[in-house]
Amino acid sequence: MALDLKKYVASIPDYPEPGIIFRDISPLMADGEAYREATDQIVQFARDKHVDMIVGPEARGFIVGCPVAYELGVGFAPARKKGKLPRETVKATYDLEYGQSALYLHKDAIKPGQNVLVTDDLLATGGTISATIQMVEELGGNVVGTAFLVELKELHGRDKIKDYDMLSLMQF
């Protein structure tokens, strides 16, 4: 029987500002059984998608994507913030509450035609994941799915990626 993964997510009220409930996945990662269960569920979601590569945005997308890539026997490519990748990159911007931010991916991270699963810890507004998908597709990758530990349903991030197969392990 699968674990109730929500028990491993701490809800911190009024962080980082009043009115926000921060969903902290640190307890899930600190518990080997829960972390394994979450990883296994994403691996099962990915198995029939013939995934060639996992891409995850900085920084917690690495925490989700790397163990999935390992279990599937495929590579992992990090989508990073400005100045963190040493070779030629592609860039995608996304909106923040007050301004914009950007992610970068090495131009050789994805080969044309590769099947890519995009992973992150949390789906909120969908900006980060949309930017990551944009870069994968610009490089010729085929996004076969997206996977998240947590989805904040009230922020409607799912609407931005409705054309992609999606897994969220927990909804708040």
UniProtKB/Swiss-Prot annotation:
It catalyses: AMP + diphosphate = 5-phospho-alpha-D-ribose 1-diphosphate + adenine. CDD domains: PRTases_typeI. It is found in: Cytoplasm. Pathway: Purine metabolism; AMP biosynthesis via salvage pathway; AMP from adenine: step 1/1. Its main location: cytoplasm. GO terms for biological process: adenine salvage; AMP salvage; purine ribonucleoside salvage. Keywords: Cytoplasm, Glycosyltransferase, Purine salvage, Transferase. Its EC number is 2.4.2.7. GO terms for cellular component: cytoplasm. It holds the Pfam family Pribosyltran. GO terms for molecular function: adenine binding; adenine phosphoribosyltransferase activity; AMP binding. The keyword 4Fe-4S does not apply. It is an enzyme of class 2 (transferase). The keyword Glycosyltransferase applies. Homodimer. Belongs to the purine/pyrimidine phosphoribosyltransferase family. This is Adenine phosphoribosyltransferase. It comes from Lactiplantibacillus plantarum (strain ATCC BAA-793 / NCIMB 8826 / WCFS1) (Lactobacillus plantarum). The lineage of its organism: Bacteria, Bacillati, Bacillota, Bacilli, Lactobacillales. The gene is apt.
